[in-house]
Amino acid sequence: RQRQMCIRDRGNALQNDLTVSGGNENSNYFFSLGHLDQDGVIKNATYERTNARLNYEAKLNDKITLSSKMSYTYTNSNRIQQSSNVSGLMLGLLRTPPDFDGRDYKGTYYSSSGVEYINRGRSYRKSIGQSSNQSYTNPLWTVNEQESSTRVNRVTVTPQITIKPTSWLQLITRGNLDFADDKRTYFFPVGDASSRANGQYQEDVFDIRNSALDVIGKANFLLSDDVNLTTTVGWSY
């Protein structure tokens, strides 16, 4: 019964996409917008992604072409503790007998002296919430009370200029900017198992900035009717 309340038979995913493209003999463009909404086989395990992309190319003349690729991605996910730890889903689930009804996974406990303890976690080994440490966290507590979320915003921009001074020589200069902020939140309420019995809140923020520059030269030589030589040299920073 607890397994059925924690784990679905199958996950669900909904993907929506929109694309627009066009152009003429001197320019072209491509735009796409997409959204993915996904629920995992474990309840409250979610993943959401929204992404947009714009590609553009313009031919200024017979020798110079400009292009740019830009993209934005936002992801928001919540992951359930699954690995081999007493706060995770599987240990509490597999070490709970099937005849134990753990649906009331939290409640109010009264000590022998009448002291009231609200929102106490209730598990097989602490069936009336007599301790702030559940020993093995009730799996329903794991999927409903804990949080392990990640939110990421990412932007990439890749401009490029291509120059063909002659019919056999091509020069490419390409840049890349990659910006991302990654915020991860972990929350274990008071009453969890192990060292987190007193509760734990943790927030990690990563600010990522990457840039690159490539300069590439391509040359094509016709040595004879049967032999063709193509050479490529480049520099990256």
Where are these regions (language model features)?
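Outer-membrane beta-barrel translocator/receptor signature
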Residues: R8-A52, K63-I64, V155
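Residue-level signature of outer-membrane beta-barrel architecture
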Residues: G22-N24, H35, A58, M70, ...
